[in-house]
Amino acid sequence: FYFLNTIDILTEPDNHALICYGDSITAQSWPDWLALRAWNEHRRHVAVIRRAVCGTRILRQYDCITYQAYGLRGATRFPIEMNVSGATDVIIQHGINDIIHPVGTDVNPFRPWSDMPTAEELERGVQDIYVEHARRLGLRVWSGTLLPIEGWRTYNADRDKLRCEFNTWLRESPLFDGCVDFDRALRDPDHPSQFAPGYDSGDHLHPSEEAYKAMAACVPGHLL
């Protein structure tokens, strides 16, 4: 329900919230499957809270009315959306739109090549915008790797190289309390720039429903 943001209730002190933060991928059903998994595993003390806006980027936002629905950049969104009662942990799966959106002003006047980040800019953005703020709130921070994109309409080898470099950092950086490796869970082991069979929704960017179930399944149980 897009008109409803949050319902807070008074509950037991040992209950807590796990925040799932991201873009259109997180706006879809993997947090729902994660909440169902927690229920089925009798982990009734955790609330899975989705904080997702389709089309959003870490570093930039559009200033034209055409793309206002793509929302605010991370520096504006994150402090607002981390205002969650009882939150202890956040899984951040964000950044793919920073990589796939720029196409050049000859193709789209609002998507210049100058918007294309480097891996270092994405890493610094995650550290400065997300991790440092989350730490000030006392949250544990879990990185979520970016999913395969081969076949997406703006895909090319350079974009995928950037995605892979960023994913390596997300897996290895000591900034995080750990990594939820969504990429490894969903990619084709024989062709890792693509989804595994049955895991592509058809647009080569968003997962299928079975893939969303797999994303929920790969979240470590101790987060629940």
Regions found by a protein language model. Give the residues of each.
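N-terminal secretory targeting modules
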Residues: 1-21, 26-27, 40-44, 224
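Extracellular glycan-modifying ectodomains
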Residues: 12-14, 44, 71-88, 96-102, ...
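Oxyanion-hole/transition-state-stabilizing segment in secreted/luminal serine hydrolases
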Residues: 58-120
